[in-house]
């Protein structure tokens, strides 16, 4: 029996089957990515209590900005490499990969230095409670040191996906997640290193996955290329072209994360009890939205490859397939969360000793958002199509509108309805972003039929 090829050919065949097949490893990879980020919270919270849980939660709001830059660089890289792949341009694929790896490591080194130096001032700016600020700063400094590993892995995973291979990143994430869990248990539980131990566990797991993914990618793209296509190790022209994609994605991801920081500062004054419940529920929410983000990334790669191959008529069907998949996932998530939300909360908190306000906050967060994930799925699929088409300014402006509205909504209502204003602002922002994107896209298509799919 022949093994299925690792790379999914997206320019031929049934779009629904292609999207479903390609999205599945991406969904599981994203879930493991979230597990990777979440095990610190679970193990620290269960072993060291609510204050340690809150410290990791506050730190995570800051690390999301760092993750955003790495993710944005990966997204921008993925779109361009997918276009090169669709056009069959191996020389540009190789040049693009080596160029972005060099550039991303330089950016990562800068972010690492800034993270180590400015951890404490930033946490003070966010009004972090004094009883957790030292632990949060320790976690943040150690996490910052791992930026080169994070960038290296994110860019390489995006390249694999752009080439139609979503399985390799998934396998690497499974390995990395298991390593992270093992070192978390060893450092936090065995050596009693607390919050710092969780940060070191993440550092080591990221390093291993980054090195292995580098070896696999260079072996696949460079050593096993029998055609020996000529390429430049570093190209200013390719970097400029890639930057036009990556810069918008980095800005968009950073805007989202900075917005989360601002929103986080609305939660912090409620105290460590509410913050612990919010942190636990936000981790569960992060798992819930991962499949929709994966579907958006699948649509982005699918769209870019078909655009590069000149098969614009296939793009509409890919978008519709992603929306259908997201709808099914949203229904399942609603049922699971409503049935098991208290048990999920128990993964992060000791419900027998946690305060009533912490539990009430977490339960309220999960219950309210369970009704709204279908909106997230539709919006993510549409944004993925926009990225694949190269409509990056429209995508960016929609994200800015989303976050701006979320911030206004939160601060306008937090004194009226309490901390629930923070999470209720999310679906409101998704709706506004989708409406803006649809209207903007139709206007753009009337001016210039850039993709031939205006009637979506």
Label every PLM stretch briefly:
Residues 27, 31, 35, 39, ...:
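Generic alpha-helical transmembrane segments of integral inner-membrane proteins
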Residues 21-40, 142, 153, 176, ...:
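Transmembrane helical elements of multi-pass membrane transporters/channels
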Residues 10-47, 61-76, 80, 105-112, ...:
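N-terminal transmembrane alpha-helices
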Residues 53-113, 150-169, 277-341, 376-390, ...:
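Small-residue-rich hydrophobic transmembrane alpha-helices
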């Amino acid at each position: 029996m022949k093994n299925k090829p690792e790379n999914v050919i997206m320019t031929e065949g049934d779009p629904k089957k292609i999207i479903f097949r390609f999205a599945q490893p991406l969904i599981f990879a994203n879930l493991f990515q979230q597990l990777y980020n979440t095990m610190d919270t679970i193990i620290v919270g269960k072993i060291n209590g609510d204050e340690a849980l809150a410290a990791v939660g506050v730190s995570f709001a800051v690390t999301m900005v760092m993750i955003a830059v790495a993710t944005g660089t990966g997204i921008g890289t993925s779109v361009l490499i997918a276009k090169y792949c669709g056009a069959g341009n191996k020389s540009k694929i190789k040049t693009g990969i080596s160029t972005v790896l060099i550039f991303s490591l330089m950016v990562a080194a800068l972010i690492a230095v800034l993270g180590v130096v400015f951890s404490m001032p930033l946490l003070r700016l966010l009004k972090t409670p004094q009883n957790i600020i030292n632990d949060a700063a320790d976690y943040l400094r150690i996490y910052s040191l791992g930026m080169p590993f994070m960038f290296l892995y994110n860019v390489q995973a995006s390249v694999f996906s752009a080439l139609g291979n979503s399985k390799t990143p998934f396998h690497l994430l499974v390995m990395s997640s298991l390593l992270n869990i093992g070192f978390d248990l060893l450092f936090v539980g065995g050596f009693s290193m607390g919050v710092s131990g969780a940060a070191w566990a993440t550092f080591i797991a990221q390093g291993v996955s980054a090195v292995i993914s580098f070896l696999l990618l260079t072996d696949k793209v460079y050593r096993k290329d029998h055609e020996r296509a000529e390429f430049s190790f570093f190209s200013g022209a390719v970097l400029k072209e890639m930057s036009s994609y990556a810069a918008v994605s980095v800005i968009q991801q950073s805007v989202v994360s900075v917005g989360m920081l601002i929103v986080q500062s609305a939660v912090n004054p409620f105290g460590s009890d509410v913050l612990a419940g919010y942190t636990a529920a936000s981790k569960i929410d992060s798992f819930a939205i991962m499949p929709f983000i994966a579907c958006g990334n699948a649509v982005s790669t699918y769209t870019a490859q078909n655009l590069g191959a000149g098969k614009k008529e296939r793009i509409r069907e890919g978008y519709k397939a992603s929306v259908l998949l997201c709808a099914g996932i949203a229904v399942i998530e609603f049922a699971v969360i409503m049935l098991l939300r208290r048990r999920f909360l128990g993964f992060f908190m000791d419900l027998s000793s946690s305060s009533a306000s912490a539990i009430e906050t977490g339960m309220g967060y999960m219950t309210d958002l369970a009704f709204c994930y279908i909106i997230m799925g539709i919006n993510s699929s549409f944004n993925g199509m926009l990225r694949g088409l190269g409509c990056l300014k429209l995508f960016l402006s929609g994200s800015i509108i989303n976050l701006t509205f979320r911030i206004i909504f939160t601060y306008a209502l937090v004194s009226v309805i309490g901390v629930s204003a923070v999470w209720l602002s999310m679906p409101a922002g998704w709706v506004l972003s989708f409406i803006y994107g649809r209207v903007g896209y139709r206007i753009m298509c009337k001016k210039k039929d850039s993709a031939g799919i205006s009637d979506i």
